[in-house]
């Protein structure tokens, strides 16, 4: 009815439609996380699963200062996959396995070192899919070199944002190193 609040599912569907107008082929992750306001395990075509964090995690969210077209990046990945389904399908499969393992670690409050290593491995695989850029790679390296457990691009790639898993007391020095390496801004985020 007009004026009645929308269910989470209905709101998620509407926000996704808006994302389609803007991006062309959005993943559906952004709208899902925003609507449900908690960690979400997302697989396209499957109802999203929210989950709990076993122990607080501290991240730096990093603005690379570079904008890039998600539509173009997705199109380029699609072309790579079409040219060599076996090779790029294997990379996508590895990313899926990393995500499943990372979810289990997050839920159990698992080892930060292992979670950080998974983030960095995920970034490397995204680079192999042409989703990263030299600037994003430099920022990930700067985060790790200054004490982050791991770092990876987030979103459409080739620009935009990255995330780095850090100890709370190291966040200021990691943020400073990132700004020195060319990050436009950083924000501290606690996931609980």
Per-segment meaning from a language model:
Residues 2-6, 13-23, 31-152, 163-192:
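C-terminal nucleotide
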């Amino acid at each position: 009815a007009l004026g009645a609040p929308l269910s989470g599912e209905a709101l998620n569907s509407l926000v996704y439609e808006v994302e389609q107008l803007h991006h062309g082929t959005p993943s559906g992750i952004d709208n899902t996380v925003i609507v449900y306001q908690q960690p979400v395990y997302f697989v396209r075509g499957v109802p999203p699963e929210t989950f709990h964090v076993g122990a607080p995690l501290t991240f730096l969210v990093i603005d690379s200062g570079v904008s890039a077209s998600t539509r173009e990046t997705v199109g380029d990945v699609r072309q790579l996959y079409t040219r060599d389904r076996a090779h790029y399908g294997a990379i996508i499969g590895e990313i899926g396995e990393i995500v499943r393992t990372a979810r289990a670690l997050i839920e159990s409050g698992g080892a930060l070192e292992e979670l950080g290593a998974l983030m960095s491995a995920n970034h490397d695989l995204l680079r192999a899919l042409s989703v990263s850029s030299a600037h994003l790679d430099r920022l990930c390296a700067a985060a790790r070199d200054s004490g982050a457990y791991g770092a990876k691009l987030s979103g459409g790639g080739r620009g935009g944002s990255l995330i780095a898993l850090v100890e709370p007391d190291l966040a200021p020095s990691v943020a400073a190193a990132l700004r020195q390496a060319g990050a436009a801004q950083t924000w501290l985020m606690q996931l609980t």
